[in-house]
């Protein structure tokens, strides 16, 4: 299947342009995933509607780690590459630590509990066991924070599905290349 065509700026809905300009300012370019989603201003607003509140509760590194765990489960190479890049370049995380996050791991027990939980939620489609909740609670996460982790998981599921359905052309470097540059 061929990737969905990325429309030029002059063919992008006007209601999406301000958000895309924000992504361009942040990344230095408009990532293809957002150019794809921007074809529906409502879908782009839905993504942003989750992103802004979560930025206040989960730090950038945690959001990237969760994104990597969820994306690995979903086989979304675009998001794995994007969040590996973002994690190293913007969140200033160690590339090896990010690689561990892809599989639900971390050198920090509290972080590992959150990332592993997001992975488990994705694998089970939310039908986790009581022991899964016990592990994350025992690591110091409150129920409100656990809900925020579930929300981030759902946000990344949405982006993974867009990428997997439309075969979004990857415009981020391989994780190995990022690690070599860091």
Model-predicted regions and their roles:
Residues 1-182:
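Hydrophobic alpha-helical segments
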């Amino acid at each position: 299947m061929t990737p969905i065509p990325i429309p030029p700026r002059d063919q992008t809905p006007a209601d999406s342009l301000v958000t895309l300009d924000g992504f361009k300012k942040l990344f230095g370019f408009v990532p293809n995933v957002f150019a794809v989603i921007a074809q529906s201003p409502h879908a782009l607003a839905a993504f942003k509607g989750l992103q802004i509140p979560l930025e206040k509760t989960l730090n950038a590194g945690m959001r990237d780690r969760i994104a990597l765990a969820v994306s690995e489960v979903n086989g979304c190479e675009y998001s794995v590459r994007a969040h590996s890049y973002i994690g190293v370049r913007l969140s200033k995380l160690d590339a090896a630590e990010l690689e561990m996050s892809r599989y639900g791991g971390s050198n920090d027990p509290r972080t590992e509990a959150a990332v592993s939980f997001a992975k488990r939620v994705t694998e089970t489609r939310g039908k986790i066991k009581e022991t899964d909740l016990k592990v994350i609670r025992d690591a110091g996460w409150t129920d409100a924070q656990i809900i925020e982790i579930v929300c981030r998981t759902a946000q990344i599921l949405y982006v993974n599905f867009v990428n997997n359905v439309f075969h979004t052309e990857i415009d981020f470097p391989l994780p190995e290349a990022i690690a070599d540059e860091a």
